[in-house]
Amino acid sequence: MKSMSRGLIRGLLITLFAAPFVLNGGNGAAAAGAADPRFPGLLQRFLSLDDPSPSAYRALRRLDASNQNLNKAAWMDVWTEYDKSGMFKYSVVAEGGSSYIRSKVFRESLETEKRVYESGAPSRAELTPENYSFAEGAAADGLSGVVVTPRRKDILLVDGSIFLKPEDGDLVRIEGRLSKAPSFWIRQVDIVRSYRRIAGARMPVAVEAVANIRLAGRATFRMTYEYETVNGRRVGAPEPRSTTNESLARSEP
């Protein structure tokens, strides 16, 4: 039972860590949506945005994960960098909590993200008419809602809604459920992905996920991004958490 539980945590968090990266919104949709009469004005503006991915960035990511039923929790602060050559690299600078999650989940997940950059897989999950159908949705938090329905079952696609700024159609949030369960053991994964304009580029700033696992119950995951540079422009000075002050700093299995 113990080895199975560890395997469930590992499989879940690797999936959650990879999912935010490939849920990058809208970058490839301009040509598809620019003059399509199927889409209302605001959605058409979003699909028509000429919004290429940033050519380079450096960010401090803060990762936290827990499962109360299995009494496991961990955290990690990681410097991540993406350069103009398309290379992704990372450096762990602070960590605490379950040594298993830190060594076998977080670090392996970073390697998974590195492989995703190299493989070009994000195109499978872009917010384009090829991947999704779109319909008018309910407003929330002063944002205009659009219902997004995947055109196929895929763990990289979200069945839910996107929320856009009403004045310009810029993407602020994606939320919903992964359209395909990552495995038999992971019954469902609900995810919220948040974006913000930084140095003119739309950048991910947070991802939160909750998963229901057979025999293990509810597991939670949160990752935030604090940027130091975007496209060569300095935008912040993030600092890692201190292991002496962090409540999860105590090493455990």
Question: Residues of each region from the PLM?
Answer:
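C-terminal segment of classical bacterial N-terminal signal peptides
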Residues: 19-27
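Beta-strand-dense domains in secreted/periplasmic systems and polymorphic toxin scaffolds
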Residues: 174, 205-209
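Cys-His-centered catalytic/binding microenvironment captured across papain-like cysteine peptidases
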Residues: 198
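C-terminal soluble interaction/assembly domains
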Residues: 191-193, 207
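Structured extracytoplasmic
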Residues: 29-159, 166-170, 180-189, 201, ...
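Bacterial N-terminal signal peptides that target proteins for export
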Residues: 2-15
